[in-house]
Amino acid sequence: MKLREVKPEIRVLGIDDGYYGPEDDRALVVGVVMRGGQWIDGVMSTEVTVDGLDVTDRIAEMVNRSKHRPQLRVILTDGITFAGFNVLDIKKLHEETGLPVISVIKRRPDVASVVSALSNLDRTEERRKIVLRAGPVHSVKTRRDEPPVYFQCAGVEPDVARVVLKRTATRHRLPEPIRVAHFIATGVTKGESSSDA
């Protein structure tokens, strides 16, 4: 599906992971379906392996089996690393779901540092390729008086992704669907949500 028009109530899925401790081998991943950055239409979840390589498949399965799938127009994720260094392949997720994927981060990523950190894990080369495959890092100011957010995207042009991010950043510089997913995931896994995504 090619995203060309960004309506005010575009159906967006925001995804983030919850807290996991050093003894945990699995982590909760929560998806929140919202209309723009205003109304919650649904919540979905899955689990992924800490420092594994299954996040792309688990999220694709979560999305494709959801009753909300027909209404979804774009997936927003909180970065490309989940549950430690379980690296999300945004291009593969786009291919498997047919939806544009925008990975959002608060600070400009240091790709070299991420690639270096991956050397401590198994299947280093596979992880490195996924990180590099995410493509160039873009930026957008979603709120007038706040710093920009950074993003990588698959299945959508950067200029259209910028419109999506501005439209969904209704209360903070990060898109509201990602923030709500963060609050739910950390609230469930820690007993209380943290103050910010």
Curated annotation (Swiss-Prot):
A Pfam family hit: DUF99
Source taxon at top rank: Archaea
Q: Which family does it belong to?
A: Belongs to the UPF0215 family.
**Protein name (record):** UPF0215 protein MK0057
Q: Read off the lineage from the record.
A: Archaea, Methanobacteriati, Methanobacteriota, Methanomada group, Methanopyri
